[in-house]
Amino acid sequence: MELLIAGKVLGSHNLKGEVKVISDLDNIEVLVGNKVILELADSQQKLLTIKKIEHLVANKWIFSFEEIKNKQDTIEIRNANIKVRRDIVGIGEDEYLVSDMIGFKVYDVKGDEYLGEITEIMDTAAHDIYVIESEEFETMIPDVDVFIKNIDFENRKMLVDTIEGMKESKVKK
């Protein structure tokens, strides 16, 4: 059973336990009535049933889960990835979503230098931007042919061609 990331919980929406979710799925409403896995920040997982989905704006949605009854219950699922079986949303084995690339290992074609893993994909007006993090650097690479040289879904790997200034030292928190 192969899972895909259907969305990410942004935070609570109201006192009734509904949450705001961002998703790049076109047919997200098919998830209503299905069980999904929420991958929590501490690497734990929670199995929940989607009761209702309402469109908010653009790629943002309001989700209601059977098991969540109030705002307090939404705290632990904030920033959780929502994972679902691929077949539920009609994604074939040879089809991919942008969110499937989260966790890909990224290498620079110059010297095959390891840059880190894709941790986020930002949707901008012009193109997506891949956020790549390692222990030392955070790199943002636009999804344009000049920089993206190869995407290998089978090995979960991306080859990029960076330019000076793309890698930034991480700020210690």
Swiss-Prot record:
Keywords: Chaperone, Cytoplasm, Ribosome biogenesis, rRNA processing. Coiled coil: none annotated. One of its GO terms (molecular function) is ribosome binding. Transmembrane segments: none annotated. It is found in: Cytoplasm. Residues 93-166 form the PRC barrel domain. One of its GO terms (cellular component) is ribosome. GO terms for biological process: maturation of SSU-rRNA. Belongs to the RimM family. HAMAP family: Ribosome_mat_RimM. An accessory protein needed during the final step in the assembly of 30S ribosomal subunit, possibly for assembly of the head region. Essential for efficient processing of 16S rRNA. May be needed both before and after RbfA during the maturation of 16S rRNA. It has affinity for free ribosomal 30S subunits but not for 70S ribosomes. Binds ribosomal protein uS19. The PRC barrel domain binds ribosomal protein uS19. This is Ribosome maturation factor RimM.
